């Protein structure tokens, strides 16, 4: 009987054309990752082999990997067959015959390769080439595993394994954070996050990585190699996955869909980030104040508030910003650039998000609903701010006077009181404002523009907040209720004024006679006495 050391063919996976087309995009991506990982594990065992065709094509081709699809029968290379036939099986060793699907074989080899020297010196795999098998044998391959030390070998069922992948079932759980994974190899990679292990080190700069694929990608930064070019626009990429993701910009393909709301994404990472909105998961925590964030970039931006680090400075006016996107948005003020135009009314905006927010005015869509009072909002941020009315949460604190605010914009507006800064000046009348939004609102006085119209009575308004307040007259809605006496109000400012009756607070003081008032209008009326009006 002939035998030889295990070859990459033994641990490779191949599909028929029909089978390949049955796989969805996520499974095809998984296939690519598994084949690369298998190849990496295989060559780490020591055998010196040339790169198999399937890996070369995965590395170089621009289209989907049809090259790994078998059509009809399986073909073996003659040089591999001769290797199998020239060696003789040692009769002293025990032989375990295992009939298994190729995916099963791959899982076992990966599993045992992680357990030290068993794979290197103590056992050999034998793949018997029997020619063409019967059609009904399908994926089965016969492998003879020779070992003195290995006495047991747990057999997996391929159908179960395939169903786990196909159904998205996550059976491998991390004991540290309880996160679950479809494949054991992915769990092994994840565990390195907790252990801090980074076994793959760049010889050029010394930077270390948890995964070999990350090292390979990083190494191309040193070489400047970008072998994957988009045929549509000519943009080049270091890895095939980046090209695949980029091409979806041209095709409009969004294969990753959220099961909660149906929103689709080009990249799986985008879907993962989006799903945290539904789950409420915020895995990134600030070590200074304990605040948590859904995205790592949000944490990085927040941490600069503690360090007062402003790396991005405007060359026009010298104003500095915590992050690059804020600087780019600011620079459009100097350039007068407003590239995002509403097709309904022609109004233009500096950033795309502003246009998206504006368009919901025309559609009337309010998808975000408060579970406490049922009020709906156009923007999620509006819902979050509104919910703080119910929770009375004020997470933003002024470091100068320790006053707290329910929104970050209120804090920024307040802080300019301490520094006296009013950088936004009206070119018509010279009046200056602390916030750009205040200047924008003010300018509508000069232009006479009233873009916000009530659909009930057609009355127009300069500001959206004015329209919102007005609409509550038609609906009779009074969502702001005093918890002391139960009285309800249309506007939050009305509730705030009313609550001063219960608290006795009188924040508005006359500088002439030191008399205090609950409302600013009462102070204004009182000052007329001193002015002789």
UniProtKB/Swiss-Prot annotation:
Matches recorded under SUPFAM superfamilies: beta-beta-alpha zinc fingers, KRAB domain (Kruppel-associated box)
Gene Ontology terms: biological process: blastocyst hatching; regulation of transcription by RNA polymerase II
InterPro entries attached to this UniProt entry: KRAB (IPR001909), KRAB_dom_sf (IPR036051), Znf_C2H2-type (IPR050758), Znf_C2H2_sf (IPR036236), Znf_C2H2_type (IPR013087)
Keyword entries, A-Z: DNA-binding, Metal-binding, Nucleus, Repeat, Transcription, Transcription regulation, Zinc, Zinc-finger
CDD domains assigned to the protein according to its UniProt record, in alphabetical order: KRAB_A-box
Compartments reported by the entry: Nucleus
Covalent S-S links between cysteines: none
Domain of life according to the entry: Eukaryota
Pfam families with a match to the protein in the record: KRAB, zf-C2H2, zf-C2H2_6
Molecular function terms from GO: DNA-binding transcription factor activity, RNA polymerase II-specific; RNA polymerase II cis-regulatory region sequence-specific DNA binding; zinc ion binding
Role, per record: May be involved in transcriptional regulation.
Name the record gives this protein: Zinc finger protein 14 homolog
Gene expressing this chain: ZFP14
């Amino acid at each position: 009987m002939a035998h030889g050391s295990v070859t990459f063919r033994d641990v490779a996976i191949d599909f028929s054309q029909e089978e390949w087309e049955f796989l969805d995009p996520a499974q095809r991506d998984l296939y690519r990752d598994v084949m690369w990982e298998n190849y990496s594990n295989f060559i780490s065992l020591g055998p010196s082999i040339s790169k198999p065709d399937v890996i070369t094509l995965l590395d170089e081709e621009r289209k989907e990997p049809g090259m790994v699809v078998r059509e009809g029968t399986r073909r073996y290379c003659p040089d591999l067959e001769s290797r199998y036939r020239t060696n003789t099986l040692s009769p002293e060793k025990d032989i375990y015959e295992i009939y298994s699907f190729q995916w099963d074989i791959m899982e076992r080899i990966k599993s045992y390769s992680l357990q030290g020297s068993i794979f290197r010196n103590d056992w050999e795999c034998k793949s018997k080439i029997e020619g063409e098998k019967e059609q009904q044998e399908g994926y089965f391959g016969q492998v003879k595993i020779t070992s003195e030390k290995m006495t047991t070998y747990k057999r997996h069922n391929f159908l179960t394994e395939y169903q786990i992948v196909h159904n998205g079932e996550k059976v491998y759980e991390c004991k540290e954070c309880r996160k679950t994974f479809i494949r054991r190899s992915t769990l092994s990679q994840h565990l390195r996050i907790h252990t801090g292990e980074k076994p793959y080190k760049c010889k050029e700069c010394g930077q270390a990585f948890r995964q070999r694929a990350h090292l390979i990608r990083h190494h191309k930064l040193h070489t400047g190699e970008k072998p994957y070019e988009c045929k549509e626009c000519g943009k080049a990429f270091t890895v095939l996955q980046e090209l695949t993701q980029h091409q979806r910009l041209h095709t409009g393909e969004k294969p990753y869909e959220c099961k909660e709301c149906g929103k689709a994404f080009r990249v799986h990472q985008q879907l993962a980030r989006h799903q945290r909105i539904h789950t409420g998961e915020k895995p990134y925590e600030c070590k200074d104040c304990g605040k948590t964030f859904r995205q790592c970039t949000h944490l990085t931006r927040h941490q600069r508030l503690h360090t007062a680090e402003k790396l991005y400075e405007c060359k026009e006016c010298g104003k500095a910003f915590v992050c690059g996107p804020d600087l780019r948005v600011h620079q459009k003020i100097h350039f007068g650039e407003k590239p995002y135009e509403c097709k309904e009314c022609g109004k233009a905006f500096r950033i795309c998000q502003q246009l998206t927010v504006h368009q919901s005015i025309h559609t009337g869509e309010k998808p975000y609903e408060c579970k406490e009072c049922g009020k709906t909002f156009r923007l999620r941020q509006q819902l979050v701010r509104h919910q703080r009315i119910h929770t009375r949460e004020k997470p933003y604190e002024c470091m100068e006077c320790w006053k707290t605010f329910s929104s970050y914009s209120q804090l920024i507006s307040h802080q300019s009181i301490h520094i006296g800064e009013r950088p936004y000046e009206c070119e018509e009348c010279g009046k200056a404002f602390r916030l750009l939004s205040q200047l924008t609102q003010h300018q509508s006085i000069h232009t006479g523009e009233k873009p916000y119209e009530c659909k009930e009575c057609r009355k127009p308004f300069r500001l959206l907040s004015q329209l919102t307040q007005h609409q509550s007259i038609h609906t009779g809605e009074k969502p702001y209720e005093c918890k002391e006496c139960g009285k309800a109000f249309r506007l939050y400012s009305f509730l705030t004024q009313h609550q001063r009756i219960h608290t006795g607070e009188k924040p508005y003081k006359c500088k002439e006679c030191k008399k205090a008032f609950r409302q600013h209008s009462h102070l204004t009326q009182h000052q007329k006495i001193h002015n002789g009006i």
